[in-house]
Amino acid sequence: MHIRSLELRDYRSWPELKVDLEPGITVFIGRNGFGKTNIVEAIGYLAHLSSHRVSSDAPLVRAHAENARVSAVAVNQGRELAAHLLIKPHAANQASLNRTKVRTPRELLGVVKTVLFAPEDLALVKGEPAERRRYLDDIIATRQPRMAGVKADYDKVLKQRNALLKTATIALRRGYGTEEGAAALSTLDTWDGQLARLGAEVMAARFALLNELGPKIYEAYTTIAPESRPAAVNYKTTIDQGLSQFSEFDAGIIEATLLTELAAKRQREIERGSSLVGPHRDDVDLMLGDQPAKGFASHGETWSFALSLRIAEFNLLKSDDTDPILILDDVFSELDAGRRQKLVGIAQEVEQVLITAAVHDDLPENLKKVLTAQHTVTVQDTDTGRISLLDVQP
């Protein structure tokens, strides 16, 4: 897979960008803050409908603009698809595929497949559980676009359930002894059923994914850091004890176990006013030997583990018969010589690689020799603020 052309309008610092891309390795050179990362972020947003840098859409729209647009023509095994996404900071985003408007932007999932490695990926190892959950959910949505809808529905149910637990605390505590309490508990029962059903689908998909990813993560880490301890990953849930007797996890078993755990923790949830059970509280344990990587890994081991997660993701998507686009965002300056060479070796075997770097000297020498194209990103101050420009001679 590769992107043949990319167009941006009012996306962050880019009032307008039109660039033709080719298979091979393309690099965007520009000083920090000039807007080079915005280019690859836009491609990643088109692939995942989310940014690796921010959690909301508002920062993606250029100051004083009403919306932003990202358009790309993707080529996959000779077939071209044109994807267009309109990003609205205060309304629902809109999308079209081959100039035909689609019902929801989620229908674009899978049109562009990317794997992005960036300095922010250290948070996969050192950060909060939400980072690791998102890592899994993004891969699942890329491979099974329907699951993005399931996860969105789960999030809506969770929000409604939490709202009930917070606003109807007194009624819920009174229980079935009052009409108001009985009504609140009946509503909570309804949310419990939906939370368990949707949550079971999310968890089953995560379990299945980790079963595939685990060996690939181990292999990638062993290749990158052969002198280090072996890497392993384990899914950690709020219902671990209830599932421990099963060797395989299916949605039906998980749903029943979730319902049991929700019933057991109901009083605590009412007291705390929040949902204590479900995939929104799960985590992935990243292990080096018998120790968790978080808190025990060295800086080099942390980089190696983060890179291994992305390499495993890439290899998994590639095994689905599609070479995803590999994006390397300002990472070569952060890696030691050994890890740089490992990454160059991978990049040379990928159909399309997009790289950002602050200066040309950040690139390994053997990578410079195989570049397909190089673009320079600069900036210009205007009446409406600083804007980014591509390949403009001073």
Swiss-Prot record:
Gene Ontology molecular functions: ATP binding; single-stranded DNA binding
Main location: cytoplasm
Positions of ATP binding: G30, R31, N32, G33, F34, G35, K36, T37
Pfam family, one: SMC_N
Entry GO terms, CC: cytoplasm
InterPro entries: DNA-binding_RecF, DNA-binding_RecF_CS, P-loop_NTPase, RecF/RecN/SMC_N, RecF_2
GO biological process: DNA replication; DNA synthesis involved in DNA repair; double-strand break repair; SOS response
Top-level division of the source organism's lineage: Bacteria
Entry keyword set: ATP-binding, Cytoplasm, DNA damage, DNA repair, DNA replication, DNA-binding, Nucleotide-binding, SOS response
Subcellular location: Cytoplasm
Family according to the record: Belongs to the RecF family.
NCBIfam families reported in the protein's UniProt record: recf
Described function: The RecF protein is involved in DNA metabolism; it is required for DNA replication and normal SOS inducibility. RecF binds preferentially to single-stranded, linear DNA. It also seems to bind ATP.
Annotated protein name in UniProt: DNA replication and repair protein RecF
